[in-house]
Amino acid sequence: MTHGEIDRPFAPGCASFEFGQVNSNTQRISGRARIEGLWRFGLDFGINRFEEELSGGGYDSIQFEDLFITIRFAQSERIQFRTGLGWRAFADDIGPDRTGWAFLYAIDIQPIDPFVASFSFDVGGVGNAVISRTRLEIGAVISFVEPFIGVEWFRVDDTKLDSVFLGARVYF
């Protein structure tokens, strides 16, 4: 790496979009953005929308949004560790929107160029519900774009919204 060149997997910002299949009639569409500034602090914002095709026709949907204030507390040339605290919201077509809190822990590893492996875990509450999400993904950085695949275990109390997903991330 030459002086001044950005190592893309650990660039100061990124945005991603992904599509996941929960089951034969439920899909997940998600987007995330992360930006980090001075002193390793950052913001991590995400939207997860689940859409279910109903047996009688039509669709039902729910949406989760989260915003974390993060700190990259450890790093080397090929690995980063982040943690954060934040806010989470839940919206559906039935009742009022609900909000709560969440905790995030994430690791990004670049074992060999161009591959990146990521793990993240977050847990929190919205109303009386406990929401947890665990993700594993692997991608390959090509210039400033990273196509990736992964698996996500998403829980809302006892409800499982697990999915396998495909996505793309853009570094800036």
Indicate residue ranges for each PLM-predicted region.
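Histidine/lysine/aspartate-rich catalytic loop segments that bind and position anionic ligands
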Residues: 78-116
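Repeated loop/turn-to-beta-strand initiation elements of outer-membrane beta-barrel proteins
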Residues: 39-45, 76-81, 109, 113-119, ...
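Outer-membrane beta-barrel translocator/channel fold
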Residues: 47-67, 81-96, 123-172
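Short glycine/proline- and aromatic-enriched beta-strand/turn motifs that initiate or cap beta-hairpins
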Residues: 1-51
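Outer-membrane beta-barrel proteins
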Residues: 2-5, 30, 37-39, 70-75, ...
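Long, low-complexity, intrinsically disordered polar/charged segments
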Residues: 100, 111-124, 169-172
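Short solvent-exposed loop/turn micro-motifs enriched in small/polar/acidic residues
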Residues: 24-27, 100, 131
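Membrane-embedded beta-strand positions in outer-membrane beta-barrel channels/transporters
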Residues: 28-34, 66-68, 102-106, 135, ...
